Amino acid sequence: MAYLVLIGDLIASRHSQNRKDLQDRLKAILKSLNSRVPKPVSPYTLTLGDEFQAVFNTADHVFDDMVQIMAALHPDQVRFSLGLGNITTELNPEQSLGMDGPAFYRSREGIDRLKDSGDLLYLGGLPDNWALLAEGALRLLSQRLQRWEANRFAILHGLLVGEPVKTIAAKLEISEQAVYKNIHSGGLEAVKQVLSALTGILNDCLAEDGPTA
């Protein structure tokens, strides 16, 4: 069976002005995501250094989770690598530790690539006919994300989970006009479209369980 492994890595966290606050915010957002229904099949777990990981059997919430984490940790940045493939060990439903297989290898390889490239997003394990398109889309998106303010991440997250503009504005305590301005300036509807398309492709691969071994 194919799974989707997410590894996140805080960038330059050791140089953060308030590292303890950053760690506390990371723990809080991961705890919140682990309490969501549906949960990851193996929960968000802090691992070595400033990394964390989780395992999914559906891509439905993966990208909005990533955006929510970025919003919570801003201005500190996070690189995310997704690995699609099999897990050759028994799945651990208690914590994302002690597992192995192609999905983990691809996700780990992606983190190494991101450290070299300076990008924020990587996806490995897609069939060849989708891989280059996904890589290009995520690299373009990475360049946008590095220039965003916290509110833009929060607005994108609201759009991804289907919140109306009025609700997003109330949560952020800004005007609806400011929300619409962010949507337009950041091309957020286009970003939402790209992430929705990638979610569909990933779910097709997870369901087929064919080209991801």
Locations of regions flagged by a protein language model:
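Regulatory and interdomain segments flanking nucleotide-handling catalytic cores
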Residues: 1-213
